[in-house]
Amino acid sequence: MDPRARYPPGIGNGRGGNPNYYGRGPPPSQHQQHQHQHQQPPHPHHHQYVQRQPQPQQTPHNSQHQQWLRRNQIAAEAAGASEQKAPPVADGIDSSSQDWKAQLKLPPQDTRYRTEDVTATKGNEFEDYFLKRELLMGIYEKGFERPSPIQEESIPIALTGSDILARAKNGTGKTAAFCIPALEKIDQDKNAIQVVILVPTRELALQTSQVCKELGKHLKIQVMVTTGGTSLKDDIVRLYQPVHLLVGTPGRILDLTKKGVCVLKNCSMLVMDEADKLLSPEFQPSIQELIRYLPSNRQILMFSATFPVTVKEFKDKYLPKPYVINLMDELTLKGITQFYAFVEERQKVHCLNTLFSKLQINQSIIFCNSVNRVELLAKKITELGYSCFYIHAKMLQDHRNRVFHDFRNGACRNLVCTDLFTRGIDIQAVNVVINFDFPKSAETYLHRVGRSGRFGHLGLAVNLITYEDRFNLYRIEQELGTEIKPIPPQIDRAIYCQ
């Protein structure tokens, strides 16, 4: 392509689809000038802009191309003068915008069925938000095709600088809903922490930082993750290098801030993912102290599936006029079918064995209510001849990281865990969740079953209910306004397999 028109109409230097943004390419090299010695400069004072000789038969595209070159001349001549209105762009935007898209390394298209939780959109495209070209490249190469409903609502508002209180179901694209505006607003030439993303667990911190790195892989943005249970010394050394976006747990970030290593005076955006958990008594004091280190004009984005009373108190104090997004017409995901089976405690392992033999499991997560029961059940499942990992909060951090990584990469079919794993963990291959021990609260139940049926796909939740659990089952059904049916002798694979 001619270097003088390196950025075709409508998608200027580093901007996606903005017809008012003009990018100017570098002047042609000496080799190129030698090639076109027969050409005359169009203006005596602007030798670097060289116009081609007219072709005998011009196609509309060539005409558009020349129009663009001439527009560059006009822009150069008008430097220092008042800004001129851009002439209307013809149908060149759509055709020329395919040039950079054609070079993208797109993943295989996901052709599985998706529910309305992610498809009921207004029809917007990511390019409608005038994002940086490099960020758009990362978005498409991550496999995102169009914004989900929560992304449509939050991305344009977050880009304006408003505070946001967003409530949406698990697995509907909340992470990208705050990562995309965060990456867009970061000035990569400014060596300072500009965005902090707070999450309640170490696994979620690793997952979120990975999403940020993948979306921003064409940007020169440095992402760092820091959590408790890892080397403080390594984090301190890392913070002396450039860091633009920091992801971590509140306690560790506060610790680094108090030591004067993590400087937040230029941090313009604070994101709280799983905000209801972050505002529990365990984390809230750390977060309130951390906010004191932020500038007064900072922007706060809060995302969660559930918002208890503690969130309201925090909102009233720190988010006086937030933009409220509520996409929770119902609490459970449309694609998840829920069943229960009445069993005695001593029959649970036998029942689990029957489920393994009858269900078409891609990957499953099995929840227990205590650390001891996790380890015992994992041992039993292995004895039955099924591959199984387990994870809980009392394991060493390195071991937890390895299990999480291996399970996500498909090294094992079944994972037994405590509620540590209920928040935000996004493993697309999981299509079955089994509550070996039924949870005590509706909130926990909601987060557990939300591990299957990610991003509008189909999933199955099976609950093993003892005599003592029967009242809890009824109460949770009422609170969530959902139906948990008795398990039939045969389950149609079409309801949870794509």
UniProtKB/Swiss-Prot annotation:
InterPro entries, sorted: DEAD/DEAH_box_helicase_dom (IPR011545), Helicase_ATP-bd (IPR014001), Helicase_C-like (IPR001650), P-loop_NTPase (IPR027417), RNA-helicase_DEAD-box_CS (IPR000629), RNA_helicase_DEAD_Q_motif (IPR014014)
Domain free text: The Q motif is unique to and characteristic of the DEAD box family of RNA helicases and controls ATP binding and hydrolysis.
Compositional bias (Low complexity): 50-61, 75-86
Domain Helicase C-terminal as annotated: residue spans: 335-495
Chief location of this protein within or outside the cell: cytoplasm
Protein's job: ATP-dependent RNA helicase involved in mRNA turnover, and more specifically in mRNA decapping.
GO CC terms in record: cytoplasmic stress granule; P-body
Keyword Hydrolase: yes
Compositionally skewed regions (Basic residues) per UniProt: 33-49
E.C. numbers: 3.6.4.13
Domain of life: Eukaryota
Region (Disordered), start-end ranges: 1-109
Keywords of this entry: ATP-binding, Cytoplasm, Helicase, Hydrolase, mRNA processing, mRNA transport, Nucleotide-binding, RNA-binding, Translation regulation, Transport
One term of GO molecular function: ATP hydrolysis activity
Name under which the protein is recorded: DEAD-box ATP-dependent RNA helicase 6
Motif (Q motif): 124-152
CDD domains: DEADc_DDX6 (cd17940), SF2_C_DEAD (cd18787)
Enzyme class: hydrolase
Short sequence motif named DEAD box, residue ranges: 273-276
Protein localization: Cytoplasm, P-body
